[in-house]
């Protein structure tokens, strides 16, 4: 079991901890599939809603909050039945806009895993306005059920009434809808090919600035992030922050980054290169490889 889970496991009911510990191996990064979830329900004796609340300390253990020292964990439950954990992340000494919120982390985890719809979000503290707006970008976002400890489950519309969202800007395919943008580049570099694939799946209906980041560590592992825009603009999630959040979930240190690639479309209204370099240089002594593609 990973050291970061030792404290929270000790505080769980024994039937749950006994069932959960074998899952928390070196590869665990917050994903529990529907079959594993069913096993945990059976072995713990908890109802699903009780189990998901009980798992929040495990999600919070994924957090990296060097500034706030405030650990927030979130769980996104997909239509597939799988659950995806996420946690807040801050960049030490850097501006707060680099921060990733727990709900963003969990939802991006689900998105990168191929999930097409989030039905429930479970979080250990009430979602801030930023996260409520981010969740409103999802497929049927207003219907997403929000679960909080010792609170009645409510749809997002309860927390964000009279919401402004994608439909107000005539967007009919919201976040997590399958995106496939035509981007191409002649390259045999596996890392660039991976970045290209993720850029083609990014969500940028407001600027058409399709983009993705891939980070490689010294042992050859790669971690990716896609651009996820928001109708309210500021809650948009940048691909570098998503990639760093992915690394954090996998228990990797940012100093292990040995290579970083940003691919973005030349046809967009903005460029993410400046913001991407700022975040990268805050955590690693690596130069950004920046590739701009003409749309087909």
Swiss-Prot record:
Annotated active site: 103
Binding-site residues for Zn(2+), renumbered to this chain: 101, 128, 131
Molecular functions per Gene Ontology: cytidine deaminase activity; identical protein binding; zinc ion binding
Co-factor note (free text): Binds 1 zinc ion.
InterPro entries: APOBEC/CMP_deaminase_Zn-bd, CMP_dCMP_dom, Cyd/dCyd_deaminase_Zn-bd, Cyt/Deoxycyt_deaminase, Cytidine_deaminase-like, Cytidine_deaminase_bacteria
Reactions catalysed: cytidine + H2O + H(+) = uridine + NH4(+); 2'-deoxycytidine + H2O + H(+) = 2'-deoxyuridine + NH4(+)
UniProt-annotated binding residues for substrate: 88-90
A Pfam family recorded for this sequence: dCMP_cyt_deam_2
PANTHER family listed in its UniProt record: CYTIDINE DEAMINASE
Function noted in UniProt: This enzyme scavenges exogenous and endogenous cytidine and 2'-deoxycytidine for UMP synthesis.
NCBIfam families xrefs: PRK09027.1
Annotated protein name in UniProt: Cytidine deaminase
Gene name linked to the record: cdd
């Amino acid at each position: 079991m990973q050291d970061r889970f030792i404290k929270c496991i000790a505080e769980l009911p024994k039937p749950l901890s006994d069932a959960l510990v074998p899952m928390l191996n070196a590869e665990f990064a917050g994903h529990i599939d529907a079959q594993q979830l069913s096993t945990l329900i059976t072995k713990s004796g908890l109802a699903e809603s009780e189990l998901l609340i009980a798992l929040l300390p495990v999600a919070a253990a994924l957090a990296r909050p060097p500034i706030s020292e405030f650990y927030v964990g979130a769980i996104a439950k997909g239509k597939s039945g799988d659950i995806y954990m996420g946690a807040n992340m801050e960049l030490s000494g850097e501006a707060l806009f680099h921060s990733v919120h727990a709900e963003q982390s969990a939802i991006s985890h689900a998105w990168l895993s191929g999930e097409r719809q989030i039905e429930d979000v479970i979080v250990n503290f009430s979602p801030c306005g930023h996260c409520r707006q981010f969740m409103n970008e999802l497929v049927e976002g207003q219907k997403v059920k929000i679960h909080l400890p010792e609170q009645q489950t409510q749809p997002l519309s309860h927390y964000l009434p009279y919401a402004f969202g994608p439909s107000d800007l005539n967007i009919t395919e919201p976040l997590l809808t399958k995106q496939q943008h035509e981007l191409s580049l002649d390259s045999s570099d596996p890392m660039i090919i991976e970045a290209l694939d993720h850029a083609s799946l990014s969500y940028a209906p407001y600027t058409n600035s399709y983009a993705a980041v891939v980070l490689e560590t010294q042992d050859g592992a790669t971690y990716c992030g896609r651009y996820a825009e928001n109708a309210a603009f500021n809650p948009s999630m940048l691909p570098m922050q998503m990639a760093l959040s992915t690394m954090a979930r996998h228990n990797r240190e940012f100093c292990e980054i040995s290579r970083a690639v940003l691919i973005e479309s030349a046809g967009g209204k903005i460029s993410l290169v400046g913001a991407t370099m700022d975040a990268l240089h805050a955590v690693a002594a690596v130069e950004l490889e920046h590739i701009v593609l003409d749309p087909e």
